[in-house]
């Protein structure tokens, strides 16, 4: 399963969801879903905006977890 780790990344850098929404120009509700890992289909545009604003790689905010464990 793919899991977003935006929450950990933002908390570590002291950035709020509101600030990220404002800087990415993405609706707060959308950023909140990504933050809470409640996204069914990932939007490459949104992931690109998040990575661009945070100056990070995709692998910094997303991880693969083997759900067979």
Language-model features, listed with the residues they occupy:
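DNA major-groove recognition helix of helix-turn-helix
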Residues: 10, 35, 42, 46, ...
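The alpha-helix within a helix-turn-helix
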Residues: 10, 21, 51
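DNA major-groove recognition helix of helix-turn-helix/homeodomain DNA-binding modules
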Residues: 45-60
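Short, charged recognition helix plus adjacent turn
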Residues: 33, 62-69
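Short alpha-helical DNA-recognition segment
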Residues: 15-33
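A short, Lys/Arg-rich alpha-helix, primarily the initiator
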Residues: 1-15
